[in-house]
Each structure stands twice: as C-alpha cells, then as structure tokens.
Amino acid sequence: MASYEVLADESYSELLSILEWFSHFSLIPTLIGGWAVFVYNSYFGSVDVDLVGRSMSGNFLDTIERYERSHGYEEVRSAGLGIEVAHRKPIYRENKFFGYVEVDVCTFEADVGSFHEDSSKKLPYKLCDDPHLVRKVNFNGKSFAHVPKKPLLFLYKLKAFRDRKYDLKTRGAIMGVKRREWMRTKVEKDGADLIALLNPEPEQYVVREKFDFQLLKQLVENHDLSFALGSVKELPDRKKVLERHVGIKQKTVEQWVNTFFEKLAR
C-alpha cells in the first residue's frame, strides 16, 4: 500500500477508537475536515482527525488528552486548526515508518472563525452547537459523532481552501520547502473535498444527504459569505484537484459547479 493509503487506514481506525473512547464518558464530539466529507462521499478519507466541541469546563480537552497519552501520541504544534491541542502518532508497519496520524482538537469557545484574508468575516465552529445544523452519525454501532450538515461542511471546507491559498500567496515565499509543499497539498485536498460535496450521486457514503441549497443560502446571507463563493468556480480548472477524483471528467465538475450557482440563485 502507498504511504497515504496506510496513513488513511490507520487514521480511520484511530477515529473510530477515539469516538468509542468519548462514548465511555457519554460525550459525542463533532467531526469536521476530511473524515466529515467521507461521511457524505467516501472517495478518499483523510490522514488527520479533526474534532470540535463544547469546552464543558475543560472536560472536552481532558477527554481527548487522556486518550492520546494512553495511545502513543506526542504533542505537536498544530498546522491544522491552529488551536489548543494537536497530537500525532507515528505509524509503523513491519518496522517501516510511514508517517504520522495527527489529531487536531478545538473547543467552540476558543475558535474565532475568522477568514485569514479578512478578520471581519467569520464562520465559527460554534455553529455546530446548533442541532439543526448537524446530524448524528453512527459509524459502527459503538462510534458516534456529530457531523455538520452538507451545506455547513461545504462552507467550512471553502474557508479552509481560501485560508490556505491566502497563506500561500502572502507567506509562501518565506515558508520552508516542506511547509510550502504541505500547504499546497492541503489546498488540493480542500478543493477535492469541495468537489466531493458537490457530487450529487457519490458512489460510496456513510450517510446519504441531499444538498440543501436553501440552508446554504441562509448561512451565506447570515454570515455575509457571498465573497467566498467565487472560489467554487476555480474547481474545474485545478488539474491536481481533479486528479483526486478518478473517473470524473472536467466537464462533469463544470456541470456540478453551474448547477450549484443556478440553484443558489433561485
């Protein structure tokens, strides 16, 4: 198996284990990022596990930190959510080192949710505290998570896409080579995740959910996010993003993007 496949496989196992751990304390975290996209379109998976939730007077972070201390994780500075807690676990198979699975955790209270290009524009994780904007997902009968409904998750991924592109544009010249390449790879994955959420007929999924354009329109209006939607038009022209969707043609993605804006305008 390729390194990414090994890491994604291990990451998914860790995700299920972490969610089961939370269930022992009667807690259900909210899953965002690549594994949240996997719920709606299981095309790729993720290396990172991204979780958010209420602080609950420190219980949320304490729960995940206890898990990580007892499961071979080491604390690192997060390059993902950029918040309180990030830990990574080295992955070996047959004595070969493949890389790390990273777990990034953020509380609703700590997250500001500002766009990097304009701090006055915000899309906070606290929106996931609204039961009308998330759904409870059962992964295997023992592992549960809340996942943002497809329109909200789409906006979170769109924000990540724009934030990382902005960081590359404004700070890429002073980044180290590895950091810059990591950021470019993340931008590609964000773009691929956006396409995955636009796909009206995914081949595989955990939960089938129709894209609610009325909810998307409401979120965009409530948070003044129309400026960000232009990035969706870029997706069909990003070759490396399209390469992550084997068998899907550029014209198909163009049709999905056109349909997206047509339905949003109704």
Give the location of each predicted region.
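Compositionally biased terminal segments of proteins
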Residues: 1-266
